[in-house]
Amino acid sequence: MQFHSSSALITPFKKDLSVDEAAYEVLIKRQIFQGMDACVPVGTTGESATLTHKEHMRCIEIAVETCKNTKTPSNSRMKVLAGVGSNATSESLSLAKFAQKIGADAILCVSPYYNRPTQQGLFEHYKTIAQSVEIPVMLYDVPSRTGVSIEVSTALKLFREVPNIKAIKEASGSLKRVTELHYYEKDFKIFSGEDSLNHSIMFSGGCGVISVTGNLMPNLISQMVNCALKLEYQQALEIQNKLFHLHQALFVETNPIPIKMAMHLAGLIENPSYRLPLVVPSKETIKLLEKTLQQYEVIV
């Protein structure tokens, strides 16, 4: 996986709640022009759980096409880490095969939610999906949403026994897990999935981030990651601290509710539309977002 900085993309909707494909392409191009290495369509932040199978695949297709046809400032191509998560292994497998066929560089697969599988079930789930494709696979551990964690021993077993399982997105909130994973397998790539811990994870064995805040501030997220990769601890910490209040504000309600509203307030999407059961943020949250964006001079 030849990338380090990436954003977990929101999925913009029109007022009729259909996917706004034109707006989606614009958002991806903004990521490209502001220095991100990769984009992550249709993950948690992309509201994948309320997209149809057809919409899910179309979002991956748009991301691949946009990245293929738009050069970065360094004349390279931004990578696509396609979200293929589902609580049904068969559906994830189908999405994984599609992502590979359409040209995604790698896939991100979350643990099945609601089912609460055993560790053996998780192992078989990930192994089955990974063996159906040739492109790299990133595990995604976010127990607050899935109800079950990929234990360190299970993650290590997957990395050791399934050749194209190359990385894990850590959104467990546990630095202990990060240090254990890195200690036992230095080549197992760890990506931060928790914006408030980006700096800490990068300096505890992490090699990159998948950021929600990056939708709004891709340039600063990219700069922080690049500083960390060069072992510029203090410079990376200064950027992390600069983003502290924004990271906090973007998670006062369930993601992606705040980031979508923030993107709307910043003029980056026309409609802050959500599909039920997600709803617009409270008036208090909107006021907080407005105040925070003013502090960052995103709006006046």
UniProtKB/Swiss-Prot annotation:
SMART domains registered for this protein in UniProt: DHDPS
A Pfam family reported for this protein in Swiss-Prot or TrEMBL: DHDPS
Pathway: Amino-acid biosynthesis; L-lysine biosynthesis via DAP pathway; (S)-tetrahydrodipicolinate from L-aspartate: step 3/4
EC numbers: 4.3.3.7
Main location: cytoplasm
Catalytic activity: L-aspartate 4-semialdehyde + pyruvate = (2S,4S)-4-hydroxy-2,3,4,5-tetrahydrodipicolinate + H2O + H(+)
Subcellular location, record wording: Cytoplasm
Residues under site feature: Part of a proton relay during catalysis: 44, 114
Sites where the protein binds pyruvate: 45, 210
UniProt-annotated catalytic positions: 140 (proton donor/acceptor), 169 (schiff-base intermediate with substrate)
Keywords carried by this UniProt record: Amino-acid biosynthesis, Cytoplasm, Diaminopimelate biosynthesis, Lyase, Lysine biosynthesis, Schiff base
Complex formation: Homotetramer; dimer of dimers.
Its biological purpose: Catalyzes the condensation of (S)-aspartate-beta-semialdehyde [(S)-ASA] and pyruvate to 4-hydroxy-tetrahydrodipicolinate (HTPA).
Protein name in the entry: 4-hydroxy-tetrahydrodipicolinate synthase
Gene behind the chain: dapA
